Amino acid sequence: VLRPGDIMLSVTGVPYDTIHSVIGIDKSSKGHGSLADFGVKFEYIELTENDEIDYDAIEKRVGRGDIKMVYIQRSRGYSLRHSISIDEIEKIATLTHSVSPDTVVMTDNCYGEFTEKKEPCDVGVDLAAGSLIKNPGGAIAPCGGYIVGRHDLVEDCAYRMTTPGLGREVGATLGTTRSLYMGL
């Protein structure tokens, strides 16, 4: 989804440590295929001093029109803040799309699945991803992840994960389908 020169903006502060190397925040990942290695820029907006979403800062930054993706980390990760609620996610998505309709809103939904009646894509998020090991896999599934959302964006992700032309038509299951369904 992100290409060289694009800007990814985290609106829930700096993401948890395990994703630093994916983004390229962790300088030890330099040269290993991070987003930064491919010329994607990363910015973030801190939460307020009360650990709330800074909607004014989001509107101001996204309103400049150069943000390709707004990133929401739903889980608190290793911090002491609260998890981001579906209502907060909806407000971020609505605000983002009102000031910049083409900006992609993406939610890292790890640990957020099945915790509320709606999921991020039900409230305006364009793309969501998470682990099949945690909530959906019931700690039974030994591996796996998912990507859901707008068809064109899911297709782009599938082509990046596998190979252009094949996309989501192929992929490893490692004989784990039974465990995955047991977890669900």
Q: Which residues fall in each region the model found?
A:
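Conserved PLP-enzyme active-site core in the AAT-like
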Residues: 1-184
